[in-house]
């Protein structure tokens, strides 16, 4: 007899109902729960999957390069990056009529195309690519790399090449290799590429496979390096008149500390970036030699952690026991990794627009908006995932004996204090922020706008001033010419930085007022509420006052019957589920704020944001409603235009989002009845009843229905806002 899906669970494969399929899919990646799984095999499977993951990433990037080279307009764009619209790829759609063919043939193409809003053109241009040939070479290289990684993944599943468990748990060598190799050497390689290829190309000097061994990146060669006279590499930088991509106004410096932006491209100086990556490379390569391996020198991580004990002795055992706890729990490792990656992704969102690293990207407003929104949403999902795996760690991997009185145990012991403090913060922020907004709404509605409560963000303005913003008149740190901080940096990076921060032509330290003060606190409310739900979910994952034995029920149980006074909605999974809604809510406010503030600045109409953002109706009317007009008019009785695709996506996003509620607001009985009815109708419908199935249709479980609802809600939410951002920005700025 053929074995049924899933092969990894005998119990599930013998289930006679449709539960077999859904639970099979749901637990396919929960390797720990599979039949016959050993710890060693678990690590080997996950390790091999990393190769597959990298292969997919490189294949995807290769596809980007290939399609732009084949169907894009990279070479035309390079000649005029500010005016030519970058093409991502062609569109072939048999439904297109003449108006659609005409509307979507843009960016200088004779056929319908998609415009690229990802910033890849700016990225490839900045790193020195100039021709389609360069793009094809890159695509081919990444394709080969992808194939090699797939082979590597396969190889590491073969008996002779499977690493043993001790190799996976060998922390110090892994840390050394990741610090020196992953961060250090890759940063050094980045510096090398910038110095040898990107900077010469930015100065009009072509560097390719044909001449890279003969073109000196600096006239003095390596002589200053070996003689210790390193400052030579910083002399004669590009001038303020430099035209990017030509030698007009170009210098010879390769490692500088100019500060600020290249006046024409409005991006960070390439020579500053090279210097930055070189410094990081040195720091990380040194850091990668700090931990003890086969030779008896260097730090031992267990010793370091065990030595981390609060001095008085009243605060417990500190980090004792953490070494083994973290080494033996993949969930806490994943939780820490996701949290770190989440933070850095959000930082990327912030820095990508405030300090654009790629030439001319600052002037491609739709790309700026897309990249910010994209990275903030990803950061949100990563952070929620971090807490989810933190909760699974407490359910599956946490050993109270091993962690007696250390930081983990103490967090669990005073979780009531942590949770209640977070609760007070959210209540305070929620009532006060909403109170101010609603008061202002009422005053506007009654025609007395002067009675609004408007609070200047003086502390934030003071911080901006200390970084050099002169507008507010604070005489502090970098905004004071006599301050020691100003004098210390005045000969190197400071003039460029001060010019940039006060120019008004970029997004560095934007001028803030009462509207910013309010939305800042609304976002703080969202962040603290999401954190409250996630922290409570993780800290209560093992048990709570109501249900002390939660751990025995696992991570994602739905309820435990009515016996204890009703135990529904209290598993760690339920906390994750609720937190995702709050996360989306918060990122929504963050991106609304960023987008509205920026489109008013880009249109030279900052007053609109300043005046309308102090009350809720202003947000609904002057941001959401006003900017949705290109979506509402994407197609109408008179035909269509090149925003029609976003209008359709806007409608479709709403549909997906609304479908989510169908799963969220109904319970099991409804589903079972619905399925029985559908099955009954199917069996009595001619032709359709030729198709039979053996599994008895059963309703989705409570947890499954919620997951399906949550997935639709999230996907629809992001899809709707993506279409809104793209259409409202592209509709204004092309």
Curated annotation (Swiss-Prot):
Chlorophyll a B3 binds at residues 662, 670. Gene3D superfamilies: Photosystem I PsaA/PsaB (1.20.1130.10). GO terms for cellular component: chloroplast thylakoid membrane; photosystem I. It catalyses: reduced [plastocyanin] + hnu + oxidized [2Fe-2S]-[ferredoxin] = oxidized [plastocyanin] + reduced [2Fe-2S]-[ferredoxin]. This is Photosystem I P700 chlorophyll a apoprotein A2. InterPro entries: PSI_PsaA/B, PSI_PsaA/B_CS, PSI_PsaA/B_sf, PSI_PsaB. Its EC number is 1.97.1.12. It is found in: Plastid, Chloroplast thylakoid membrane. Chlorophyll a B1 binds at residue 654. Its main location: plastid. One of its GO terms (biological process) is photosynthesis. One of its GO terms (molecular function) is oxidoreductase activity. HAMAP family: PSI_PsaB (MF_00482). The chain crosses the membrane at residues 46-69, 135-158, 175-199, 273-291, 330-353, 369-395, 417-439, 517-535, 575-596, 643-665, 707-727. It is a multi-pass membrane protein. Pfam families: PsaA_PsaB.
């Amino acid at each position: 007899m053929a074995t049924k899906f899933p092969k990894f669970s005998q119990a599930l494969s013998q289930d006679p109902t449709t539960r077999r399929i859904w639970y099979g899919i749901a637990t396919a990646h929960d390797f720990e729960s599979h039949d016959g799984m050993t710890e060693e095999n678990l690590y080997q499977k996950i390790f091999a999957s990393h190769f597959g993951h990298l292969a997919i990433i490189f294949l995807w990037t290769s596809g980007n390069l290939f399609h732009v080279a084949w169907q894009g307009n990279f070479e035309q764009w390079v000649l005029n990056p500010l005016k030519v619209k970058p093409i991502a790829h062609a569109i072939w759609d048999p439904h297109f009529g003449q108006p659609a063919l005409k509307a979507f043939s843009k960016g200088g193409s004779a056929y319908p195309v998609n415009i690229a809003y990802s910033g890849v053109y700016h990225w490839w241009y900045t790193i020195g690519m100039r021709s389609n040939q360069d793009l094809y070479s890159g695509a081919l290289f990444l394709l080969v790399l992808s194939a090699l990684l797939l082979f590597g993944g396969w190889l590491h599943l073969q008996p002779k090449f499977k690493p043993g468990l001790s190799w996976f748990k060998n922390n110090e060598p892994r840390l050394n290799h990741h610090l020196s190799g992953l961060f250090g050497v890759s940063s050094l390689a980045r510096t090398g590429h910038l110095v040898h290829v990107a900077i010469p190309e930015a100065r009009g000097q072509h560097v390719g496979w044909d001449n890279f061994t003969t073109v000196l990146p600096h006239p003095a060669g390596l002589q200053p390096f070996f003689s210790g006279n390193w400052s030579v590499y910083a002399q004669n930088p590009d001038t303020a008149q430099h035209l990017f991509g030509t030698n007009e106004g170009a210098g010879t410096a390769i490692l500088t500390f100019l500060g600020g932006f290249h006046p024409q491209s409005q991006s960070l100086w390439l020579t500053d970036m090279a210097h930055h990556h070189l410094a990081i490379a040195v720091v990380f390569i040194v850091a990668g030699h700090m931990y003890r391996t086969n030779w008896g020198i260097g730090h031992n991580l267990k010793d370091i952690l065990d030595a981390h004990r609060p001095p008085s002795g009243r605060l417990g055992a500190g980090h004792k026991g953490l070494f083994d706890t973290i080494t033996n729990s993949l969930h806490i490792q994943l939780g820490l990794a996701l949290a770190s990656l989440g933070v850095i992704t959000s930082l990327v969102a912030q820095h990508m627009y405030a300090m654009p690293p790629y030439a001319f990207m600052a002037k491609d407003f739709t790309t700026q908006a897309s990249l910010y929104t994209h990275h903030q949403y990803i950061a949100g999902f990563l952070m929620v995932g971090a807490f989810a795996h933190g909760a699974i760690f407490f359910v599956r991997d946490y050993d109270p004996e091993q962690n007696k009185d250390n930081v983990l145990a103490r967090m669990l012991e005073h979780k009531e204090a942590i949770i209640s403090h977070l609760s007070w913060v959210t209540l305070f922020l929620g009532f006060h922020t909403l109170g101010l907004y609603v008061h202002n709404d009422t005053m506007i509605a009654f025609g007395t706008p002067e009675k609004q409560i408007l609070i200047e963000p003086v502390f934030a303005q003071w911080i901006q001033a200390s970084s050099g913003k002169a507008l507010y008149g604070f005489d502090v740190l970098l905004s004071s010419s006599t301050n020691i901080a100003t004098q210390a940096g005045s000969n190197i990076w400071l003039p460029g930085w001060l010019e940039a921060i006060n120019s008004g032509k970029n997004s560095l330290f934007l001028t803030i007022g009462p509207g910013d003060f309010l939305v800042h606190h609304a976002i703080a409310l969202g962040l603290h509420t999401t954190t409250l739900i996630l922290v409570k979910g993780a800290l209560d994952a093992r048990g709570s006052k109501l249900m002390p034995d939660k751990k025995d029920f696992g991570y994602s149980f739905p309820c435990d019957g009515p016996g204890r006074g009703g135990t529904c909605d209290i598993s760690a999974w339920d906390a994750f589920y609720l937190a995702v809604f709050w996360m989306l809510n918060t990122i929504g406010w963050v991106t609304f704020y960023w987008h509205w503030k920026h489109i008013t600045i880009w249109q030279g109409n900052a007053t609109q944001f300043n005046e309308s953002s102090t009350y809720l109706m202003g947000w609904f009317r002057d941001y959401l409603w006003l900017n949705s007009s290109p979506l509402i008019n994407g197609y109408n009785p008179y035909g269509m235009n090149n925003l029609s695709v976003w209008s359709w996506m806007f409608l479709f996003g709403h549909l997906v989002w609304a479908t989510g509620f169908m799963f969220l607001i109904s319970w099991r009985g409804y589903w079972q009845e619905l399925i029985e009815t559908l099955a009954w109708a199917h069996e009595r419908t001619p032709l359709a009843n030729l198709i039979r199935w053996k599994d008895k249709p059963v309703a989705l479980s409570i947890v499954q229905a919620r997951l399906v609802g949550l997935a639709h809600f999230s996907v629809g939410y992001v899809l709707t806002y993506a279409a809104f951002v793209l259409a409202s920005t592209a509709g204004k700025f092309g």
